[in-house]
Amino acid sequence: MAEDVPQQSNRITLEKDSVAWAPCMLGENFNHGKKCSIGALAHIGRNVTIGDNCRIQGSAYIADGCVLGDEVFVGPNATLLNDKYPPSGDSKYWKPVTVESGAVIGGGSTIIPGCNVGKFSVLGAGSVLTKNIPENQVWAGNPAIFVMNRSEYESKREQ
């Protein structure tokens, strides 16, 4: 049996005071804001735009054309899809996901093509989102449903 061997992460310094950890995939025409962090094994597709102060955790998958606003958190193994009827191969059929500023995408969650996550909303870990989430709401489950307002969520976090 082989022994565990500690490995050093390879820090990739990006412009605008942002960082990615190798290995990861940063697609062609990827555009990021200031002070972003992208975890190891993340896949950021082509023509993806993410705003300032975003954090993409390891092994997250963000399909081509998706848009994330400022201060978005995407948990590990989260998946943002763009192709509702794969494999289309033709971007004119794609419906990229939009995640608005201040939103949180829990680890292991999946967002179906064309969905929008509203400002300051939360999608719980392991959820499957098939509808748009309005601003300031928390949704969870498979399929994801409304659970509470963001203000109630913040109150529970502080307890």
Question: Where on the chain are the PLM-derived regions?
Answer:
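Conserved active-site beta-strand element of glycosyltransferases/polysaccharide synthases
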Residues: 139
